[in-house]
Amino acid sequence: MEARVLWLLVVVLVLGSSSLAVAYQGLATNLCEVPPKDRVDCGYPEITSEQCVNRGCCFDSSIHGVPWCFKPLQDTECRF
């Protein structure tokens, strides 16, 4: 019985550590430099910055009256 518990613990630790290695990288800062009047809403009222970023959006709560969670600029650079 102890061997099963030990193997289960090993499997859980391996799977847990591998999921940590694939962390969200976020957007380049320049992609979030959207003028306030051009922001396209990407969230919902009371969305947190973490929830917004996890959706692939930008978050800036410093300007009132415009969306805080908004779509980033389109990356026009080609990547190979």
From Swiss-Prot:
GO terms for biological process: maintenance of gastrointestinal epithelium; regulation of glucose metabolic process. The keyword Disulfide bond applies. GO terms for cellular component: extracellular space; secretory granule. Coiled coil: none annotated. PROSITE patterns: P_TREFOIL_1 (PS00025), P_TREFOIL_2 (PS51448). It is found in: Secreted, Extracellular space, Extracellular matrix; Cytoplasm. It comes from the Eukaryota. GO terms for molecular function: identical protein binding. Keywords: Cytoplasm, Disulfide bond, Extracellular matrix, Secreted, Signal. Residues 1-23 form the signal peptide. Pfam families: Trefoil. The keyword Chloroplast does not apply. Disulfide bonds join 32-58, 42-57, 52-69. Residues 30-73 form the P-type domain. Its main location: secreted. Involved in the maintenance and repair of the intestinal mucosa. Promotes the mobility of epithelial cells in healing processes (motogen). PANTHER family: INTESTINAL TREFOIL FACTOR-RELATED (PTHR13826), TREFOIL FACTOR 3 (PTHR13826:SF16). Monomer. Homodimer; disulfide-linked. This is Trefoil factor 3. It comes from Canis lupus familiaris.
